[in-house]
Amino acid sequence: FPTRRSSDLAICKAGMLFITLPSGRSLSYVRPRLTQNRFGGESIEYLGIGPAKKWERIESYGPKFVENIVQGISRDLLCEAMLKLRDRRIVAHVHDEVIVEADLETPVQEVCDAMAQCPSWAEGLLLRADGYECSYYRKS
């Protein structure tokens, strides 16, 4: 990934924390604030939808933000792959998988090659895709 200053990646603006992903898309956190957690350490709280399906303050910490960033980048990579496969009949996607309904003559490797193409915003990232043929969906 291209090197950027950390000050370019996260910004607080108008009561929101925006974390910019390499794709240019942003993760958004509503009304963030630094707080002290139950162990006496520093944590970050923001407004989000809680288990009761109502707005509430959610406590988070560094590794959780890293997890959100990794999941966001993974989602962006999957979307890029799906755009490359838009001429195929994508019937579903599950996490990092694309499920394509295709003629028996369609080579699986063709779909794998499309998924392994690195987007310009992730230049240098090593991608590989594995695939298989079956007559119904199953987890490999």
Roles of regions detected by a PLM:
Residues 4-140:
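Conserved catalytic core of nucleotide polymerization and phosphodiester-bond processing enzymes
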